[in-house]
Amino acid sequence: MKTKEFHFNLPYSLIAQYPSEKRGSSRLMVLDPKLQKIYHENSVNNILKYINSDTFIIFNNSKVRKSRMYAESELGNNIEFLILDRIGTDLFTALISKSKKQIVGNVYKFPEGLMGEILSKNNSEIVLKFDNNVDEDYFEKHGFVPIPPYIKRDYDKIDEDRYQTVYSKYVGSAASATAGLHFSRDLFSTFEKNNIEYDFITLHVGLGTFLPVRSKKVEEHNMHFETFLIEDCVATRLENAKFLGKKILSIGTTTLRALESSYDNKLKKFKTGQQSTNLFIYPGKNYCFKFVDMLFTNFHTPQSTLLMLVSSFAGKDFVFSSYEEAINKGYKFFSYGDAMLVLNHI
């Protein structure tokens, strides 16, 4: 399958540059792939029209690290880093700006005199070794929230709150699992009042989620691994919910990939604990969804693995016709944009 089949033209004016005024106030497009119907809601809070106590909602509670860092090169140039994964107390994978000019052995001066050296390099991806142990407080103090490059404005303090979910808990993501940004504490209270169960897994968002597909053929894309955690108690609740016939609603593609990677359809059990996945779901792969019944997600970038996953879940033609309708109706796209609820998969 050709990657360009997942391209679409989007007016720049529809790329959300700021979050909605309040969490939950974004618009919601609802897709029913089986009936081939599309519904429109003026607020994500209206999700209650489509779910009930027979729904079990599962979220990704990874917290975004302030992973955009700036350092001075030996030549005095300002170099930007995006910290990805911690692989040791003083070792991280990262992306580096002006990558063609940066070579193994280069040393950079970070805030507080911390020095970092490139140990290895693969295109713009590097392994960075600091001359001291680095804890999360350091990034919290000196880093910046890594808002995506299509948000073309200066860094704003609002991003420190709104690019993070209200339930984020474990630091490790280099980008937000943006589907969760729509859910307010009030909406969680409403779930509880309506006896709608929910729980959390943790998948740290990295290159596997946000790296674009650059190969001409979809099948040739190299999906990066991302780490995730499913606790025993969460797995038990999920398994019981499925056994009782409840619909499993995944909040975001990251959550879906973790669940689908870990679930054994024969044993009807999850593998629990720390794991990793490079699961790449796309139309034409004939992937059979084992566990997730419903998907809540954002409107994704062209030719992204996220758009391909949604296209596999709901049907490529139906998804692209819904995107066309969203554009015509002025929906906002990408991280701070509006949301989509897919009621079932094909």
UniProtKB/Swiss-Prot annotation:
Q: Which GO terms describe its cellular component?
A: cytoplasm
EC top class named in words: transferase
Q: Note whether Cell wall biogenesis/degradation occurs among the keywords.
A: no
**What does the UniProt keyword field contain?**
Cytoplasm, Queuosine biosynthesis, S-adenosyl-L-methionine, Transferase
Which reaction does this chain catalyze?
7-aminomethyl-7-carbaguanosine(34) in tRNA + S-adenosyl-L-methionine = epoxyqueuosine(34) in tRNA + adenine + L-methionine + 2 H(+)
Q: What is its EC number?
A: 2.4.99.17
Q: Which domain of life is it from?
A: Bacteria
One Gene Ontology molecular-function label: S-adenosylmethionine:tRNA ribosyltransferase-isomerase activity
Q: Which InterPro entries match?
A: QueA (IPR003699), QueA_dom1 (IPR042118), QueA_dom2 (IPR042119), QueA_sf (IPR036100)
GO biological process terms, alphabetically, are: queuosine biosynthetic process; tRNA wobble guanine modification
Q: Where in the cell is it found?
A: Cytoplasm
Membrane-crossing segments per the record: none
Kindly give the HAMAP family that the UniProt entry links to this protein: QueA
Tell me, what does this protein do in biology?
A: Transfers and isomerizes the ribose moiety from AdoMet to the 7-aminomethyl group of 7-deazaguanine (preQ1-tRNA) to give epoxyqueuosine (oQ-tRNA).
- Report the sequence similarity comment from the record: Belongs to the QueA family.
Subunit structure, interactors included: Monomer.
Q: What is this protein called?
A: S-adenosylmethionine:tRNA ribosyltransferase-isomerase
Give the organism the record lists: Borrelia garinii subsp. bavariensis (strain ATCC BAA-2496 / DSM 23469 / PBi)
Q: Which gene encodes it?
A: queA
